[in-house]
Amino acid sequence: MAKLLALSLSFCFLLFGTCFALRDQPQQNECQLEHLNALKPDNRIKSEGGLIETWNPSNKQFACAGVALSRATLQPNSLLQTFLHQRSPEIFIQQGNGYFGMVFPGCVETFEEPRESEQGEGSKFSDSHQKVNRFREGDIIAVPTGVVFWMFNDQDTPVIAVSLIDTSSFQNQLDQMPRRFYLAGNHEQEFLRYQQEGSEEEENEGGNIFSGFKRDFLEDALNVNRRIVNKLQGRNEDEEKGAIVKVKGGLSITTPPEKEPRQKRGSRQEEDEDEDEKRQPHRHSRQDEDEDEKRQPHHHSRGGSKSQRDNGFEETICTARLHQNIGSSSSPDIYNPQAGRIKTVTSFDLQALRFLKLSAEFGSLHKNAMFVPHYNLNANSILYALKGRARLLYALNCKGNSVFDGELEAGRALIVPQNFAIAAKSLSDRFSYVAFKTNDRALINVCQKKLLQLLSIWKEMRPGSSSSTAPFHFLFHPAVTQTTKQQLDLVPNQYE
């Protein structure tokens, strides 16, 4: 009897497992892509202080990668209103400088502004908030799930921020459609129109998380008057100002003074970069590393690549470093004065990326320079062109078929699934891009090294074929072509 009961339970578990497998079956076929396209935003929502553009997350390419992409443009003296996300966005600052802040539940307000009291009995704090950070062009900002986020442009030039949202994150308990939960304002959802296409749902009238509450209830719950409740719910706005609003008179932020404005320092480096690289090869010095370390908190090195385990004294979420610069002005990981540079950031460099399970890569190529064929070992890659255009950008699927052969120009995005081989050649004086990776420790493998190994094995197995020329031809920048040919000749000679 006991054996019969155990056998029955086994069949039940097998039946349930089969049902769950059938339910997940459609998602397993989303990456059977025969053709890729360089996509541009297909939805635009204008606001008082800027606009937000989005790509369709239901597109087969984005569904394969499990991500959503958006681009926000903030005009001078404009504020991206506070919101929280059910997923963790990774934001790249394409252009501009400004401030951003996050509100972590349970963390104390450590920035306080003293003010003399009218009676002269000392000082009292009139304003306090959690830490506010300064961002600049080329920064990667990690926003943990459920954390309130805002951004402000205090400069005279627009700010352009590109955001990647991991729709397949394990922290998401809703469906795959991205949603922003705003805490203020009266505006519509950026991605909601994709969900409403083909349905007869009500028009998206906008609002925030307080709009549905009754005013009497909010007055008692928040201990505020009716005027503040109306502003909180956006009732006093004659028209929808949107998610980005103009700040009359500027925004007062309590921050420590800086010795030198970062935006001026970054702009000078970018202006001198082209001339320095053309005049002579740049020799990376310890002074450059020291300058970057001064701009970054010293606790950055505590979670370095020496150890993957926490020792109990790692940075807490309240004091975690949430942004790092990977732009042209930072020290590159790969550098060739005649070809270009590449800079990456992973959870080894920025520990906050562990919460997002995302990483990023910034690349800049000179004209006619090539990024050799390579593929991502453990991540999907979302390429977004920042400047210029690239030609001969190939992507090969598991069948060896070319799924993309064309140009990628500024403002367009291309999804490169895991293990799809890809190569790029710059057609502009400078082609720059940012690649979002769906792994906080993403790795790439260059196909050239694999070909060298295969060629060596082939020569070893067939010693008599050493006199024949190798049938492999690569397109490289002229400065490295001769070196590569020497490598191809030297490796087989070891087995002759």
Swiss-Prot record:
<comment type="subunit">
    <text>Hexamer; each subunit is composed of an acidic and a basic chain derived from a single precursor and linked by a disulfide bond.</text>
</comment>
<keyword id="KW-0758">Storage protein</keyword>
<dbReference type="InterPro" id="IPR050253">
    <property type="entry name" value="Seed_Storage-Functional"/>
</dbReference>
<feature type="disulfide bond">
    <location>
        <begin position="31"/>
        <end position="64"/>
    </location>
</feature>
<dbReference type="GO" id="GO:0015066">
    <property type="term" value="F:alpha-amylase inhibitor activity"/>
</dbReference>
<dbReference type="InterPro" id="IPR022379">
    <property type="entry name" value="11S_seedstore_CS"/>
</dbReference>
<comment type="similarity">
    <text>Belongs to the 11S seed storage protein (globulins) family.</text>
</comment>
<dbReference type="InterPro" id="IPR006045">
    <property type="entry name" value="Cupin_1"/>
</dbReference>
<protein>
    <recommendedName>
        <fullName>Legumin</fullName>
    </recommendedName>
</protein>
<feature type="signal peptide">
    <location>
        <begin position="1"/>
        <end position="21"/>
    </location>
</feature>
<dbReference type="InterPro" id="IPR011051">
    <property type="entry name" value="RmlC_Cupin_sf"/>
</dbReference>
<keyword id="KW-0022">Alpha-amylase inhibitor</keyword>
<feature type="domain" description="Cupin type-1 1">
    <location>
        <begin position="36"/>
        <end position="230"/>
    </location>
</feature>
<keyword id="KW-0708">Seed storage protein</keyword>
<feature type="region of interest" description="Disordered">
    <location>
        <begin position="240"/>
        <end position="311"/>
    </location>
</feature>
<dbReference type="GO" id="GO:0045735">
    <property type="term" value="F:nutrient reservoir activity"/>
</dbReference>
<dbReference type="InterPro" id="IPR006044">
    <property type="entry name" value="11S_seedstore_pln"/>
</dbReference>
<feature type="domain" description="Cupin type-1 2">
    <location>
        <begin position="324"/>
        <end position="453"/>
    </location>
</feature>
<keyword id="KW-1015">Disulfide bond</keyword>
<dbReference type="Pfam" id="PF00190">
    <property type="entry name" value="Cupin_1"/>
</dbReference>
<dbReference type="InterPro" id="IPR014710">
    <property type="entry name" value="RmlC-like_jellyroll"/>
</dbReference>
<feature type="compositionally biased region" description="Basic and acidic residues">
    <location>
        <begin position="257"/>
        <end position="269"/>
    </location>
</feature>
<feature type="disulfide bond" description="Interchain (between alpha and beta chains)">
    <location>
        <begin position="107"/>
        <end position="318"/>
    </location>
</feature>
<keyword id="KW-0732">Signal</keyword>
<comment type="function">
    <text>Seed storage protein. Alpha-amylase inhibitor.</text>
</comment>
